[in-house]
């Protein structure tokens, strides 16, 4: 009984290799189904994202090892001309479990503490469960991984603090204004960065978001997605600057789109009510002199990156706590695996002694009263429990390596002359 894992991720392979190995959901279902239906695996699951494609497999045949699985997925993806075995990592036994726990808890992510990965692992398990390739081992492994992720989220601060520019901008605005639901927001630029910032704002209860963009249809599409349906023509948005408490700029331009003179006029109309300008452009969208104006808080990408660096430093400080949680869960999972491996021997041992007990009691069934027979059954049950206590305890006891399990199982089976067990869980 073994769970092995091979795969490529952001640590082992560049993006052009990861792209060649990635599986769509349809391919994922087909791949794990083929592995199990062919008998190559008794259980199989694949986690496939933009940063990783990882196989988690319970082999069904002796020849199915890490090298075999690497070759199998390379062939499946017809990628022999680009992908080599050295692009993959290998994991075995508890190493496989530790790796999935680290992935699920987001300490193996490209961005430390990035919470999206847990949902992707859950999707991988859902796919395997739907097609019937997640059996007792992968089911227990995945649910333990989900438990690890939950404990990491509730017991540590690993996922706290912004680690993207767009989210850091929104977090900063919330720190300054506290309640964003009462503030009016202008987003200048509806590209990827602007869209992320707007969605983060919306998630923080900012509902009064107005969008302007050179291509108005793009602004309208984002406004509709957010449910604000509020758009300003790009040619005239400067006439309304004084109306906004928060201005986010995220456009591609070589010249400043906002200068000090324009913002000074806007502040006069606002009677110096504070304004935050979050400049997410590169090159910068806003003249740095704007930041010198009274009650004008200007933050550019460098200022936001400083916040991100501090947050990442805080996240890294949480790693010992996270690893302690993983170690704790790994011990429990390893003990469960060991118990599963020795369970057939424990059942056989108990069955043999019960059979001996019943045969001996049968000899006296017609020689003693019903009451005496019950007392004899009770007495022999207690004796058997005490006799079997130590062998069963020894079988269940943790071992240093999985290789030691067969030796102690064989010892017990030989001592008590037990027949060979069913090999399905060995």
From Swiss-Prot:
Entry-linked Pfam families: GlutR_dimer, GlutR_N, Shikimate_DH
Gene Ontology BP, a term: chlorophyll biosynthetic process
Binding site for NADP(+): 189-194
Enzyme Commission number, as recorded: 1.2.1.70
Pathway(s) annotated for this protein in UniProt: Porphyrin-containing compound metabolism; protoporphyrin-IX biosynthesis; 5-aminolevulinate from L-glutamyl-tRNA(Glu): step 1/2
Record carries keyword Hydrolase: no
Entry's Gene Ontology molecular function annotations: glutamyl-tRNA reductase activity; NADP binding
TM region(s), chain numbering: none
Top class in the EC scheme: oxidoreductase
Catalysed transformations (reactions): (S)-4-amino-5-oxopentanoate + tRNA(Glu) + NADP(+) = L-glutamyl-tRNA(Glu) + NADPH + H(+)
PROSITE patterns, per the entry: GLUTR
InterPro entries: 4pyrrol_synth_GluRdtase, 4pyrrol_synth_GluRdtase_dimer, 4pyrrol_synth_GluRdtase_N, GluRdtase_CS, GluRdtase_dimer_dom_sf, GluRdtase_N_sf, NAD(P)-bd_dom_sf, Shikm_DH/Glu-tRNA_Rdtase
Annotated binding of substrate, by residue: 49-52, 109, 114-116, 120
Site (Important for activity) residue list: 99
Alphabetically ordered keywords of this record: Chlorophyll biosynthesis, NADP, Oxidoreductase, Porphyrin biosynthesis
Matches recorded under CDD domains: NAD_bind_Glutamyl_tRNA_reduct
Subunit structure: Homodimer.
Record remark: domains: Possesses an unusual extended V-shaped dimeric structure with each monomer consisting of three distinct domains arranged along a curved 'spinal' alpha-helix. The N-terminal catalytic domain specifically recognizes the glutamate moiety of the substrate. The second domain is the NADPH-binding domain, and the third C-terminal domain is responsible for dimerization.
NCBIfam families: hemA
PANTHER family reported for this sequence: GLUTAMYL-TRNA REDUCTASE (PTHR43013:SF1)
Further details from the record: During catalysis, the active site Cys acts as a nucleophile attacking the alpha-carbonyl group of tRNA-bound glutamate with the formation of a thioester intermediate between enzyme and glutamate, and the concomitant release of tRNA(Glu). The thioester intermediate is finally reduced by direct hydride transfer from NADPH, to form the product GSA.
Protein purpose: Catalyzes the NADPH-dependent reduction of glutamyl-tRNA(Glu) to glutamate 1-semialdehyde (GSA).
Classification via HAMAP family: Glu_tRNA_reductase
Protein name: Glutamyl-tRNA reductase
Source organism of this protein record: Chlorobaculum parvum (strain DSM 263 / NCIMB 8327)
Phylogenetic placement of the source organism: Bacteria, Pseudomonadati, Chlorobiota, Chlorobiia, Chlorobiales
């Amino acid at each position: 009984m073994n769970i092995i894992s091979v795969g490529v991720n952001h640590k082992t392979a560049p993006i052009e290799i990861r792209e060649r190995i990635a599986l769509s959901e349809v391919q994922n279902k087909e791949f794990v189904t083929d592995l199990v239906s062919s008998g190559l695996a008794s259980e199989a699951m694949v986690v496939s994202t933009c940063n990783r494609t990882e196989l988690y497999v319970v082999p069904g045949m002796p020849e199915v090892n890490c090298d075999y699985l690497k070759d199998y997925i390379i062939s499946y993806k017809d990628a022999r001309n680009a992908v080599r075995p050295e692009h993959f990592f290998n994991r075995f036994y508890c190493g496989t479990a530790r790796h999935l726990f680290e992935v699920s808890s987001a300490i193996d992510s490209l961005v430390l503490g990035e919470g999206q990965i847990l949902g992707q692992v859950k999707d991988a398990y859902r796919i395997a469960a739907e097609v019937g390739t997640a059996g007792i081992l992968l089911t227990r492994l995945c649910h333990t991984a989900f438990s690890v992720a939950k404990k990491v989220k509730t017991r540590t601060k690993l996922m706290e603090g912004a680690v993207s520019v767009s989210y850091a901008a929104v977090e900063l605005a919330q720190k300054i204004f506290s309640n964003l639901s009462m503030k009016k927001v202008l987003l200048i630029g509806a590209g990827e960065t602007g869209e992320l910032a707007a969605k983060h704002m919306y998630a923080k209860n900012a509902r009064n978001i107005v969008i302007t963009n050179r291509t108005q249809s793009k602004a309208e599409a984002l406004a509709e997605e957010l449910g604000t349906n509020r758009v300003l023509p790009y040619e005239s948005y400067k006439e309304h600057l004084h109306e906004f408490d928060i201005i986010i700029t995220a456009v591609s331009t070589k010249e400043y789109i906002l200068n000090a003179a324009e913002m000074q006029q806007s502040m006069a109309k606002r009677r110096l009510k504070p304004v935050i300008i979050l400049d997410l452009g590169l090159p910068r969208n806003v003249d740095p002199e704007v930041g010198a104006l009274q009650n004008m808080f200007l933050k550019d990408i460098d200022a936001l990156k400083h916040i991100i660096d501090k947050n990442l430093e805080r996240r890294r400080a949480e790693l010992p706590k996270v690893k302690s949680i993983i170690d704790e869960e790994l011990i429990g999972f390893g003990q469960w695996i060991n118990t599963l491996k020795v369970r057939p021997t424990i059942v056989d041992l108990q069955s043999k002694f019960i059979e001996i007990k019943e045969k001996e009691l049968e000899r006296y069934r017609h020689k003693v009263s019903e009451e005496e027979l019950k007392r004899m059954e009770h007495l022999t049950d207690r004796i058997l429990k005490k006799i079997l206590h130590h062998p069963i305890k020894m079988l269940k006891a943790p071992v240093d390596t999985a290789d030691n399990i067969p030796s102690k199982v064989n010892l017990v089976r030989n001592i008590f002359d037990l027949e060979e067990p069913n090999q399905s869980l060995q």
